[in-house]
Amino acid sequence: MRAYREPMDRPEVTLANYDAVYDFYRDHQQPRAIARLAYAMLAARYRPRVNYRAGARDAVREMIATGTPVVIVANHLTHSDQYTLAATAWRSPLRTLIGRTRVLAKDELFREPRQRREVDMMGGIPVFRAKNHGVRAVADAGRRMMDVAALRLSRGDALAIFPEGTCNTGDPAQVQAVGSGIGHIVRRAAALGVQPALVTVGIAYGPDNDPGRPASVFITLPVPELAGSPREVTQRVAEELQCAVDGAVARY
């Protein structure tokens, strides 16, 4: 993927610098034309086979056309999943959201300059994970991240999340525990006056979990409004994600 030039005032992505980091990503906008080109290239390279629950393709298209903010969730199996998801976006009605989708991504992806440019171009927002920095250390940064994610939804952006938080090294057909962060983001977005919809994407790379082969991808019927407490939202997301994974595995 060809890199593009970002503004020179990008803050260093470190936990100690999280306030400046989230001030930057609160308003950061990638060039949409370049993002579309990159997603098209990823679609040509990764070639996911995209299938849908009956009626889901039209339902997703119609929902996006209403301008409803969308939360896109996918299961996490390998370090190639973000590229598979980007390729899926290009090959589905999600294409219209390219260039205005924020993607929550672990902070390690923002360290190397070239990789950071690519992640920024794809709409990345850094996440400082407790498994890397400790629960107490990331608490304040986590709250800022959720505030920024909710604000972007309230402005009409979509938000893409791998809510399991880490690669599934166990049974790829079984969704891991879903973190409560997605529930808190949705609750914060509701406080800002928007009720996001949910689009769920299941990914399967076959029995060997080999990302070198085209993935089976399955998109379920969208949930028009994510509502309830953070815990209730998180539970609904987990249920929808397992249904999507079941569909992807069955169609591999």
Task: Walk through the language-model features, giving the residues of each.
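A general structural motif
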Residues: 67-69, 98-100, 156, 193-195
